[in-house]
Curated annotation (Swiss-Prot):
<feature type="domain" description="Radical SAM core">
    <location>
        <begin position="296"/>
        <end position="567"/>
    </location>
</feature>
<dbReference type="InterPro" id="IPR024560">
    <property type="entry name" value="UPF0313_C"/>
</dbReference>
<feature type="binding site">
    <location>
        <position position="314"/>
    </location>
    <ligand>
        <name>[4Fe-4S] cluster</name>
    </ligand>
</feature>
<feature type="compositionally biased region" description="Basic and acidic residues">
    <location>
        <begin position="618"/>
        <end position="632"/>
    </location>
</feature>
<keyword id="KW-0004">4Fe-4S</keyword>
<dbReference type="Pfam" id="PF11842">
    <property type="entry name" value="DUF3362"/>
</dbReference>
<dbReference type="InterPro" id="IPR013704">
    <property type="entry name" value="UPF0313_N"/>
</dbReference>
<feature type="compositionally biased region" description="Basic residues">
    <location>
        <begin position="633"/>
        <end position="644"/>
    </location>
</feature>
<keyword id="KW-0408">Iron</keyword>
<keyword id="KW-0411">Iron-sulfur</keyword>
<dbReference type="InterPro" id="IPR007197">
    <property type="entry name" value="rSAM"/>
</dbReference>
<feature type="binding site">
    <location>
        <position position="317"/>
    </location>
    <ligand>
        <name>[4Fe-4S] cluster</name>
    </ligand>
</feature>
<dbReference type="InterPro" id="IPR023404">
    <property type="entry name" value="rSAM_horseshoe"/>
</dbReference>
<keyword id="KW-0949">S-adenosyl-L-methionine</keyword>
<protein>
    <recommendedName>
        <fullName>UPF0313 protein CPE1196</fullName>
    </recommendedName>
</protein>
<dbReference type="InterPro" id="IPR022946">
    <property type="entry name" value="UPF0313"/>
</dbReference>
<feature type="binding site">
    <location>
        <position position="310"/>
    </location>
    <ligand>
        <name>[4Fe-4S] cluster</name>
    </ligand>
</feature>
Length: 662
């Protein structure tokens, strides 16, 4: 028996296993990493467990068909994904500039995958084997299954199923449906005619071929020519994205019909345990050793996946359209067993980097009704506030963390996935919060409030009001009580739909009041499949059909970004222009509440800002020791601005930031 426990990547590997032919060949735009944080690994191992022979072609040269032929023609078909990240996001920044590194590629080298990899790979496979079955999946296919707005081309593109020429699309996490698809292919079915499986999409020649109850969406032609129709279409997709109550959706594309079956039910706890117990090698293929490995493994190698799905439903997040709103989780025993395995790694230093998921402190469905009735159609679980029916309980997660941190060989267990601070604050039992601060923060707790303007938070689907400030103050009280020096690092977003210049200034004032300057700011990135992207494209909120302000110009987006780093002298001129444009000259000058000094009030070499530039030292001023100062500042700031409509009361001006970006 071969010592190589990775799946075959070449003919020699197949010979070692005694294979003459693969059942499936999986083509991916990422390097081959056999770890359950990567879709390629999960799908290939699930199929292997079901008795199928799977080979891997990772990052093939798409300029010829040679790489696509290196494992031969598979008996049942090709499986294609664009990698763990949409290739366009992987390649380009929000300003559409080419990124410098690809963390899913040896040496971080760019250029090893094409733009729109799924489409390119399918075309090459068709060139190599004209009539072979092709099934596409992964994040790129999932989020582009409908006609969708494409930010990089600034137009509406067809469903990726149409553009790729594939026979079938599986969306979501796909473990259930890929095995069912494989079984039908194994029985001799043509991929084009496997049409009844939840979580799949196919193309029909006419509506008469669709037997399930369905909704006919506006066609590709209609949504690509009218933005209001696009928004209305997205609302239907959004409402039907539920495995319990969702219905089949149909969208015409130039005389043919893309049929999107309702989502597959999430895996049960027992099913998840089985998936995560498969024989992953938990690292990259040894062919990459000569290039120093693959950087993407580093963040997940000593991390544990606890859950899937998210009840948070943030507008800018794609989780709803990929994993869904119903949270499921692995058993404690499954996670503890994997933690014990990690302690045996030669390079393990005693630190578990994370136990989490899309949201670390979610371990179960938001309420009992979700598994029988589905998630609510016209309400969100946590926005604008936490639903009264949501079951807030950290006890199981807390028990899990305690078990793992007590294991021999483990020094610390950190939580680096996102935490919903509003969910933490809604828990009447403080035990989890206290133990989080005491045991699970690696010096800095990263959370994602994203903004402070109530208007912007409304469009983001994020909690508004005093919740974050209360969380921040409580975090520092507990930290101080424990005698620790720990900080909160907030994720912030600029230029989200609905964010006007005055909203960005409000956030800048908030950062001034807590004496914090973020080292990085994320501009809103319109990626496929999100509510926020639909707002960006149409200028409408699909949930209400009301108009939404969209910061589109490079000038305004630069202003909003610079305002969040107003202490940086390089941003002085653009911050000055932004304040003048907004009529907020009261924030220019030498007063304690001014963001920047007046141009005529400093000499050469002096800082333009009234505040020290925000490096690590300044960032760490965001601590509990400043709480009394925050209170004084808050009251004074409100009087100085004299504008309650800006969304602050005295209390809400005090805080900092907190929660994970999805």
């Amino acid at each position: 028996m071969s010592e190589n426990k990775f799946l075959p990547i070449c003919k020699d590997d197949m010979i070692e296993r005694g294979w003459e032919q693969c059942d499936f060949v999986l083509v991916t735009a990422d390097a081959y990493i056999d770890h359950h944080s990567f879709g390629t690994a999960i799908i290939s191992r699930v199929l292997e467990n079901a008795g199928y022979k799977v080979g891997i072609i990772a990052q093939p040269d798409w300029k010829s068909v040679d790489d696509f032929k290196k494992l031969g023609r598979p008996r049942l078909g090709f499986l294609v994904n664009g990698g763990n990240m949409d290739p366009m996001v992987n390649h380009y920044t929000v300003s559409k500039k080419l990124r410098k590194k690809d963390l899913y590629t040896p040496k971080g080298e760019m250029g090893k995958r094409p733009d729109r990899a799924t489409i390119v790979y399918c075309n090459k496979i068709r060139e190599a084997y004209k009539d072979v079955n092709i099934v596409i999946g992964g994040i790129e296919a999932s989020l582009r299954r409908f006609a969708h707005y494409d930010y990089w081309e600034n137009k509406v593109r067809k469903s990726i199923l149409v553009d790729s020429g594939a026979d079938l699309l599986v969306y979501g996490m796909s473990e259930k449906q890929i095995v069912e698809v494989a079984d039908f292919l194994n029985q001799g079915f043509d991929g084009k005619y496997i049409r009844h499986i939840p979580g799949t999409c196919y193309i029909a020649d006419s509506l008469d071929e669709i037997y399930e109850e369905h909704i006919v969406l506006p066609s590709f032609k209609e949504v690509s020519s009218d933005k209001r129709t696009y928004a209305e279409c997205f609302k239907i997709q959004y409402d039907e994205q539920d495995p319990v109550r969702g219905r089949t959706l149909v969208q015409e594309h130039n005389g043919k019909y893309v049929v999107i079956n309702k989502p597959e039910m999430p895996l049960s706890r027992e099913e998840l345990d089985r998936v995560y117990a498969l024989p992953y090698q938990k690292t990259y293929h040894p062919i990459y050793e000569k290039d120093g490995g693959i950087a993407a493994i580093e963040e997940v190698k000593f991390s544990l996946v606890s859950s899937r799905g998210c009840s948070g439903n943030c507008s800018f997040c794609a989780i709803t359209f990929h994993q869904g709103r119903i949270v499921t989780s692995r058993s404690e025993d499954s996670i503890v067993e994997e933690a014990e395995e990690i302690t045996k790694y030669d390079d393990f230093k005693g630190y578990i980097h994370d136990i989490g998921g899309p949201t670390a402190n979610f371990r179960k469905p938001a309420c009992k009704k979700q598994l029988t009735l589905g998630a609510c159609k016209h309400k969100r679980c946590m926005s604008p506030g936490i639903c009264k029916n949501m079951e807030v309980d950290h006890r199981e997660y807390l028990h899990l963390l305690r078990r793992v941190r007590k294991l021999p060989g483990i020094k610390k267990v950190f939580i680096r996935s996102g935490l919903r601070y509003d969910y933490i604050m809604a828990d009447k039992d403080d035990t989890f919060f206290k133990e989080l601060v005491e045991h699970h923060v690696s010096g800095q707790l990263k959370v994602a409030p994203e903004h402070v303007s109530p208007n912007v938070l409304k469009y983001m689907g994020k909690p508004a009001g005093k919740t974050y400030d209360e969380f921040r103050r409580k975090f520092f009280r507990i930290t101080e009580r424990l005698g620790k020096k720990q900080f909160i690092i907030p994720y912030l977003m600029s230029s989200h739909p609905g964010c006007k210049l005055e909203d960005a200034i409000m956030l800048a004032e908030y950062l001034r009041d807590i004496n914090y300057q973020p080292e990085q700011v994320q501009d809103f990135y319109p990626t496929p499949g999100t509510l926020s992207t639909t707002m960006f494209y149409t200028g409408l909120d699909p949930l209400t059909m009301e108009e939404v302000y969209i910061p589109r110009s490079k000038e305004e987006k630069a202003m909003q970004r610079a305002l969040l780093q107003f202490k940086n002298p390089k941003n002085y001129n653009i911050v000055y222009d932004a304040l003048v444009k907004a009529g907020r000259e009261d924030l220019i000058g030498n007063g304690p509440k001014c963001l920047i000094r007046d141009k005529n009030s400093f000499g050469k070499g002096n800082n333009h800002s009234n505040h020290k530039s925000g490096g690590r030292k300044n960032r760490n001023e965001n601590s509990g020791r400043r709480e009394s100062e925050d209170k004084k500042r808050s009251s004074h700031s409100k009087k100085q601005r004299g504008n309650k409509s800006r969304g602050f009361d005295q209390k809400s001006q005090r805080g900092s930031k907190g929660k994970k970006r999805r």
